[in-house]
Each structure stands twice: as structure tokens, then as C-alpha cells.
Amino acid sequence: MSDKPASMYRTIDKPSYTRREYITGIPGSKIAQHNMGDLSAEPDDYPVQISLRVEEELQIRHGSLESSRLSANRHLIKELGEGNYKMTLRKFPHQVIRENKQATGAGADRVSDGMRQAFGKPVGTAARLNKDDIVFTAYCDVEQASVVKEAFRRAYNKLSPPCRITVDRGEELLVS
């Protein structure tokens, strides 16, 4: 069965699940890794820090986070090589998403319970983000900043909210 559209889970209209230990059957996260590039490097080893920020409050599903991470990281590896940057995914999908499955087709009214006991079963996880939260951060050299910005542009094409790319450190080096 395919996923429901992301618009069903985008808004934060319900309180979060606070006790995950009581929930059974939570699907595993699709996010393979949070740190990419040169894992042994410290952030201070690079003069430029660039971030991808969201511009509104919402939830992003784990599959969307993983696909944006993959597209950005693949572009950086192809253009810069594995050891010339450091990128971090800053959010983790803690929020459990539920879905009340509905039977469809002939005779579904006899099988389905409709809205009786409609709490729903866990179908995935999502990350809750506030306005101006940072999703990705990349550390690079001055010459590589344009490549990182292009990678983040590819990443936010996979995300549903409007995003912006900000230079958090080293902006004076990029201008001169």
C-alpha cells in the first residue's frame, strides 16, 4: 500500500506522542545516516558554514528527509569528493504518524468499521520543525560554497515547505 500524500501530515494540528515506549509497531526510520562527508573533520576546520532553513512550521516525513539528504549528498560527492566537505542532517523524525485504514471496493461497508475506534495504526515518523529551524548544515571551503548551495537547492526541491539557504559563517570571505 502506498503512502498517503504529505499534505495530510504537513500541518501540526495534534499534540505529539509523548510516550513512544507505549506504542508498538513503529516503522523504522528511512534515514540512513546523519553525518556525511569527512567524518573526522571538525566544523571549525572549514571557514564557511551554510545552512538550509525552513520558513514555516510543519512536519516533514522521514522519506522526504532521506530523499533530500541523498540528492544533496550525491551532488556533493560527485562535485567535491568524499573528504572535502562535512554535511549534517540536523533533525530526527521523532513524531509518530498514524493512519486509520479504510477498506474500499465492493462490500467494504460490511468489513470496515468506519470511524468507530478511529485512533489509527502507526505508519511512519516525521520531524517537527518550527519556523527558521535548520534542516541541513554543510561546512566547506570558500571555493566550494557555490557547489554546496546548488546541492541545497536540489535538497529543498524534495521538501514541501519553502526553504532558504543561509551562510552562517564566512560570508565576508564569499563577498570579497
Swiss-Prot record:
A Gene Ontology biological process term: translation
A UniProt-annotated Pfam family: Ribosomal_L16
Alphabetical UniProt keywords: Ribonucleoprotein, Ribosomal protein
Domain of life from the UniProt record: Archaea
MF annotations from Gene Ontology: structural constituent of ribosome
UniProt key word Ribosomal protein: yes
Gene Ontology cellular component list: ribonucleoprotein complex; ribosome
Keyword Cytoplasm annotated: no
Family annotation (NCBIfam families): PRK04199.1-4, PRK04199.1-6
Family as reported in the entry's similarity comment: Belongs to the universal ribosomal protein uL16 family.
Name of this protein: Large ribosomal subunit protein uL16
Organism: Halorubrum lacusprofundi (strain ATCC 49239 / DSM 5036 / JCM 8891 / ACAM 34)
Lineage: Archaea, Methanobacteriati, Methanobacteriota, Stenosarchaea group, Halobacteria
